[in-house]
Amino acid sequence: MIASGGIADHSDIKQVIASGAIAAQIGTLFLSCDESGIAPCYKNALIQAKHDSTVLTRAFSGKLARGISNSFIKQLKQLEELKNIQPLPYPVQNALTQPLRKLAGSQNNTDYLSLWAGQSVHHCHKTSVSALLNRLTQPT
């Protein structure tokens, strides 16, 4: 078993290995690294995120996924609650929001960009992959 989700530091890795996992998979923390190719505004959103910044949403893709809450997610949630308008299923919703996401990315507009992030997003820092790997592999 490979453990994933919520892993942010060396102690988390030790804990999942002690629980029987053979490895730990980490995603979100690498997005904020200098070497990541995501939009600068996305990196900044990750670095500024708090522990309660993420929500589960179907707004951008039609599939349930966790991301940093923004204006688009909030507006779609209002439509769901007030008018019972649901996002379309994947891949239709994903295709429909693609031009919006592309434009938002080109304008560094995080209000209409999908900002996928896990529950450990509040542990994101401006760092290099090398420094992150050192932090993950060395006890504090």
Task: Name each model-derived stretch.
Residues 2, 8-140:
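Conserved active-site-proximal phosphate/metal-binding subdomains
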